[in-house]
């Protein structure tokens, strides 16, 4: 497979994946495929999809479900949601969280346009009316700081937790009682693109990289 993954590759990644997956992935990709030249763009799903349609990107990493007509997609991994809360919060004593316990909580989420926001609400079976949306942030790091200051709770994807988004805060993480409170991360490219085999190879590489980090 050494003749695959050579030349230039333009990869788009959404902001709730890029900062947490790319740093270690890029180093290992460079070591394994030194002839691969990567150009990276981080943006919201809708913009990345447009760049992909227009041929400005070769493939994109994003979260499903997301409507992608004319594109081939492959699933990479499930990214579990965890509830993040500050010490002393009334949900702290719960070993695991039932989705119904989120109703009426002060919930901190990303602003409109970030698909993580919709995926988190959907995965937790929450309507906007069920929650008290007290703050809309621009990044997961911002949300973590707001929780640390006692302003509410938030939902964090496992990939961000593995990449130590909590830093040196004393925040608590709780799993949900229900299985599959998660989003699905995948790759997408144009159906007409002849490099399908390379993209499937890259998908395997990313999958392995993420699994290795989560088992560390």
Write out the residue ranges for each language-model feature:
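Beta-alpha-beta core module
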Residues: 68-75, 79, 94-95, 141-191
């Amino acid at each position: 497979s050494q003749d695959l993954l050579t030349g230039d590759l333009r990869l788009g990644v959404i902001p709730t994946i890029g900062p947490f997956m790319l740093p270690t992935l890029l180093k290992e990709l460079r070591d394994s495929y030194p002839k691969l030249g990567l150009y990276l763009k981080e943006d919201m799903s809708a913009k990345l999809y447009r760049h992909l349609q227009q041929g400005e990107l070769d493939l994109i990493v994003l979260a499903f479900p997301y409507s992608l007509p004319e594109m081939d997609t492959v699933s990479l991994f499930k990214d579990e949601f965890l509830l993040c809360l500050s010490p002393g919060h009334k949900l702290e004593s719960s070993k695991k969280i039932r989705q119904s316990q989120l109703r009426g909580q002060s919930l901190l989420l990303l602003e409109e346009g970030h698909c993580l926001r919709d995926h988190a609400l959907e995965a937790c079976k929450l309507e906007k009316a069920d929650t008290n949306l007290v703050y809309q942030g621009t990044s997961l790091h911002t949300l973590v700081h707001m929780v640390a200051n006692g302003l509410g709770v938030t939902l964090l994807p496992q990939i961000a937790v593995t990449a130590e988004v909590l830093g040196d805060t004393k925040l608590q993480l709780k799993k949900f009682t229900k299985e599959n409170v998660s989003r699905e991360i995948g790759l997408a490219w144009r159906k007409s693109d002849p490099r399908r085999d390379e993209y499937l190879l890259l998908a395997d590489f990313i999958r392995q990289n993420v699994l290795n980090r989560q088992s560390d």
